[in-house]
Amino acid sequence: MNPSGTIGVLEQNGEEHLATPILGPSVHSDNPQERIQARRLRIAARQEARRREALGEYLDGKKESEEEQSKSYKQKEESRLKLTKLLLCGTELVTNIQVAADVREIHRRVEEEETKRQRLEKLENEVKTSQDKFDEITAKWEEGRRKRIPQELWEMLNSQQVHCAELIEDKNKLANELQQELKIKDDQYVKDLKKQSEDITLILERMEEQVKNVMKNFRQELIHIEKAFESERQELLSSNKKKWERALQAHNAKELEYLTNRMKKVEDYEKQLNKQRVWDCEEYNTIKIKLEQDVQILEQQLQQMKATYQLNQEKLEYNFQVLKKRDEESTVIKSQQKRKLNRLHDVVNNLRTKYTKQIRQFQDDNQSLTSDYKRLVTQFKDLQKALRHFIIIDEEKFREIWLMNEAEAKELAQRAFDVDRIIHSQHLGLPWNMPDLWFLNNVGPISLQQQKSVTQILEELLLQTEDEATEAAMSEDEDYMDLPNQISAKTTTKVLMLLCDESGFLIESKLLSLLHPLEKSECYLLRLDAIFSALAIEDEDDLYKLVNFFLRYRAHRLSSAQASSSIHSNVERTSLMSALERLSLMSQTDKGSMVSKSDQEPTEQEDEQEGDNASLSSRELEEQEDLSSPRFIHPNDVLKILEAFVTGLKKPKDAQPVLKLKKETRDNSKDTEYWESLAAVIPFFKQNLWDALYKALEKYYLVLTERAKLLMENESLEQQNAEMQSLLQQYLQAKVNTELQIPPTQGFRMPSK
């Protein structure tokens, strides 16, 4: 067990211990080795404190008083402490080998650093002495060129040969020492491998021994814990059995007491029932007397009602006679109205014949216009197809030229990178990394076109729709999808509130349940947000288009109502149907067909519509100013207006007029930057480095050429020396020398070959 209080005490003691001044190494010292040693000591102290805490030991050597605990709990604590100590000892026994190996490795590395330093110093000294000797030899070669006497030249060559032999001997000696040191290191490495294998074998043996020991101790402690639990279980069984017997005795006593109390309550309830029975009989008698009196009163009222019924019957007979006379008068009026209705039927038939003729004429015109429209659409599609073909060809040519130039530029850049890599790795001995440039991964022309949403594309197409043949004629009649010039905030608020009240079906039921506790303004805002999401209204232009559509719809309904009021009341239904038909045609068909229909209206309706169109603007202004009047927009028309608006906004391509396609131009703002970046893959500082390296290599080439010349001169001198030695040998071996008293061989020493 590791109580939290004990941990807090240990941490506090550890902090106080760290806070006290330490005479040993400090972490604030300027020496890095001293700081490292101080940190190691502090970590070791903390680990020792945690080990003591895990073993149940205390820093102050005192043990807190423990509460009374069960045998099983005490046995578990004893087993835990014993096993913890066993594990710590086993771990320490196993890790001692690793610690010793680490110490040996640390000493080996320190010795290796020292020997390496000494070796480097020795090599540096050797290089300096060798360079001095080599400089001395090269200087004597310059002196030898000035000499012309063979004997002096021979002495100089002997001395140079001795110096060269000494230099080579020093180099060979150094090489032998290094080889001997390498051999010693190989032997030491083999010994270290053997030692490591022995350590690993010892660790494995100790680990197996510790595992067996731990398993054995775990089994023993488990047996002790089971025995403690078994004894505690027997004690609990005996104590619980005694408690159960005492509880049964108390329960029996309570049941006996409950039985006596129940008998007393039964007697009391019987007495109360007898009293209640007597009281009910008395109350029944009083109610019976009261009801008999009520029956007598009701019989008297029935006699009065019969008298009233007789009087009312006489009045009804009189009224029947009066109504009969009025019915006769109504039959006469009905016959007159029938004759009038027949005349009106004749008028309706005439109007229907005119209507059928106009419909036929409109259909013929529509067919002719449709054929012209289809012909123009096919021509336009052919033109678009040719245009797309040429655009694709131009783009392919542009892309091919781009890719060709790009491949050539990237090949040159790769060659430059290869040169830079060779310079860094072979000449400078520096690591070289491939530069991560954004333009090297690009393939093909750079595209910076911004993606547009579907709603933006629809708005652009709707705003760019033009029809030069019908633009002037229909600009004032049915431009429902254009933005209004100005709409007051009050008008917009009224329209939005009406839309919010009548379009609740577009809102989810879960959202409606969440909106009930909110205020009215917040509720309206959230409802309108959900409705706009359902209708795909995303910006301010779409909102004002919707408001303008509502206002134009109301103005059109007023004009159609005034036109229909000029005709007789019996053809009101026909005019209403025609107005609705015109509204649907205006929201679903193109503008050209509406021009032909409006031009071919009957002359009688043209006069009425001219008057209506003249007063249309004034009525719109009045209705926009007085939107609170009940004649603004009927709530039943809101769904129709929404349907027409959505149909007009999301109309299919075949029902829309021919749209002008906007030519998409490619953004070439980054082309210059891209090609300039490809041309400048090697920065200016690297070019300066190349120039400096080129100059150094030129100097190095001059030195090599001079060295080659010197080698050729040396070879020629060696050849001359060999010829002179052969001549001298012939001279010394001549027979004339044997006849002389002092032969020439006694005057000088022959050089050894």
From Swiss-Prot:
Q: Name one GO cellular component term.
A: cilium
Which regions are flagged for Acidic residues bias?
A: 601-611
Coiled coil where?
100-388, 703-739
Domain of life of the native organism: Eukaryota
Location of region: Disordered? 1-33, 55-76, 587-628
Which keywords does the record carry? Cell projection, Cilium, Coiled coil, Cytoplasm, Cytoskeleton, Flagellum
Keyword Cytoplasm found: yes
What subcellular compartments does it reside in? Cytoplasm, Cytoskeleton, Cilium axoneme; Cytoplasm, Cytoskeleton, Flagellum axoneme
Compositional bias (Polar residues): 587-597
GO biological process: what's one of them? axonemal dynein complex assembly
Per the record, the similarity remark reads: Belongs to the DRC1 family.
Q: How does it assemble?
A: Component of the nexin-dynein regulatory complex (N-DRC). Interacts with CCDC65/DRC2, DRC3, GAS8/DRC4 and TCTE1/DRC5.
Query: What's this chain's function?
Result: Component of the nexin-dynein regulatory complex (N-DRC) a key regulator of ciliary/flagellar motility which maintains the alignment and integrity of the distal axoneme and regulates microtubule sliding in motile axonemes. Plays a critical role in the assembly of N-DRC and also stabilizes the assembly of multiple inner dynein arms and radial spokes. Coassembles with CCDC65/DRC2 to form a central scaffold needed for assembly of the N-DRC and its attachment to the outer doublet microtubules.
List the protein's name.
Dynein regulatory complex protein 1
Q: Which organism is it from?
A: Mus musculus (Mouse)
The gene it comes from is: Drc1
